[in-house]
Amino acid sequence: MTAATPFARCLTLAAWLGATLATGAQAVELPRWEFGLGPGLVSVPDYRGSDERRQFAVATPFLIYRGDTIKTDREGTRAQLWGADNMHLDFYFGGNLPVSSARNQARAGMPGFKGSLDIGPALDIRLSESADQLTVVKLRLPLSYGFTLGKSQQSLGWQTAPTLNIYNRNTFGWQGLSASMRTGPIFATRQRNGYFYDVPEQYATATRPAYEASAGYAGWQLGATLSKRFERVWVGAFARYDNLSRTAFHDSPLVRTHHYTMGGVALIWVLGESAERVNVE
């Protein structure tokens, strides 16, 4: 069985911090790169649909890179492939933590989930912007392909999760306070839904019947971030809620709840930054 390593936990929390601590809307001059370190605390279920969750604290690395092509910021790590006035095409990266079935009652006796990586293109479309340039509304259209990490890689199939995104700077009139919100549906192939929610015959029990998930609707997500910088210190928080009602796998015996929530907070000391400044929205 695979357990979540401290390194994997750091990467996951760092990815969320990229979304939390880099939120903005108005064009400003910022360092080309920044890095830092600090404590973070995250609470997350074992997987979407699990009624068991983990809390962990880690020393969290923080990296922001505002390159012309490669960027690590509020949308995660990505390579910008093409851009126009109100839209651009990215190639982005994401992933999932490994989960040990030895610690999850619903999956007892089944193989654990390996750590996985998601990669794929995403089209970002700017829909509107406030007159003061403090609020921007965007539509994000991603398509990702997933695969497990380790010696024997396994395909997880495809997923798309279009979201409506709102970014706001100087939230509640507080200078430097930034917030964001995103919401939208998730759709996945049978292969992806099956990896998380299938119960093969050899693992069926009296209370966990054999099950095969279908392709299609995989839930609705709602996420929010809030952050504030004080000179050399970043303070940030994030939260996410997914509703799994009426999904293609809602009746899987591995789905113990249709409500998925995760969140975290972090305090980051910015240890270094570039002298070079770039214009960033």
Report residues per predicted region.
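Residues on the lipid-exposed face of transmembrane beta-strands in outer-membrane beta-barrel proteins
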Residues: 39-43, 59-65, 76-81, 119-127, ...
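Short glycine/proline- and aromatic-enriched beta-strand/turn motifs that initiate or cap beta-hairpins
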Residues: 28-69
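Short loop/turn motifs that connect adjacent beta-strands in outer-membrane beta-barrel proteins
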Residues: 27-33, 48-49, 68-87, 128-137, ...
